[in-house]
């Protein structure tokens, strides 16, 4: 029985190990979260991040009066790396006879890592561990076809001490925003595609588009992305094997016996936010509801 990628399968080519940096760049391009959040250097053992919770407050004083004493308050979180990985199998004949494996893998494998990372951060998939934050508990804000939903998102983020910096919209939310108007009847969403990945702005805040943000009634995420950090331990790793036995579902696949090889791509990533309430999930009822 033929298994997975062979000469009859359309779409991939051989990936030399030295292209790891190119692959990592593609992973960044496929992850909205990694573009918007602040990147930190993440050691293998994790890192304690100090956060400022409140600011000191000054006061007016009269002549000879005691000066007020006020302090910052601090908090801390541990950001730890967790491994995200993917193995894909190919036939030796496919590697020999097809000339496009490198190009296709550059496009596909990084996208898989980026999508998984984003879906986890957005709260659609479970966190890999306790020291990895998601936005699953962010407050819901309903988009109702007018400006009110976007104003409510701004208000929700501000009430938690944040300043909404970016909108992350699904294709559905983008279409909805194009039809929405503000209180004066003017278009709410101002399209303006830029090289940095933004597609326009809503209330002077840049908007970016991501398919990964859509799940159920959630069509977008808005928030103060200066309050989010992500890190990677060593970047992306790529490994090849034609000797291993791979478990796929209930099948044990001996690569040597079948003249096949496996490509493994993996990375160790972490994500933390100072306060999940400085984000908002943009929701929209399904058509007909």
Range-by-range predicted roles:
Residues 43, 139-261, 265-267, 289:
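Extended oligomerization regions of viral-like shell subunits
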Residues 75-78, 85-163, 266, 281-289:
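Alpha-helical scaffold segments that mediate packing/assembly in large oligomeric complexes
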């Amino acid at each position: 029985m033929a298994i997975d990628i062979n000469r009859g399968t359309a779409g991939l080519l051989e990936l030399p190990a030295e292209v790891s940096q190119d692959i990592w760049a593609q992973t960044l391009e496929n992850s909205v979260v990694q573009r918007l959040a602040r990147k930190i250097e993440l050691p293998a053992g994790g890192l304690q991040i100090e956060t400022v919770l409140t600011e000191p407050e000054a006061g007016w004083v009269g002549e000879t009066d005691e000066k007020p004493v006020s302090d910052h308050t601090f908090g801390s979180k541990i950001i730890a790396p967790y491994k995200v990985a993917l193995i894909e199998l190919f036939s030796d004949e496919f590697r020999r006879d097809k000339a496009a494996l490198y190009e296709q893998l550059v496009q596909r494998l990084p996208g898989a890592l980026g999508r998984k990372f984003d879906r986890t951060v957005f709260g659609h998939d479970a966190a890999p561990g306790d020291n990895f934050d998601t936005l699953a508990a962010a407050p819901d804000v309903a988009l109702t076809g007018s400006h009110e939903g976007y104003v409510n998102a701004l208000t929700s983020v501000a009430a938690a001490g944040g300043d909404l910096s970016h909108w992350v919209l699904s294709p559905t939310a983008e279409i909805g925003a194009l039809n929405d108007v503000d209180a004066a009847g003017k278009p709410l969403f101002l399209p303006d595609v830029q090289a940095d990945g933004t597609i326009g702005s809503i209330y002077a805040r840049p908007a970016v588009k991501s398919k990964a943000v859509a799940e159920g009634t959630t069509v977008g995420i808005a928030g103060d992305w200066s309050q989010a950090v992500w890190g990677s331990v060593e970047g992306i790793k790529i490994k090849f094997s034609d000797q291993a036995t791979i478990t796929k579902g209930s099948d044990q696949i001996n690569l040597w016996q079948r003249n096949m090889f496996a490509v493994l791509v993996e990375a160790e990533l972490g994500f933390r936010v100072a306060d999940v309430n400085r984000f908002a999930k943009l929701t929209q009822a399904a058509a007909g509801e």
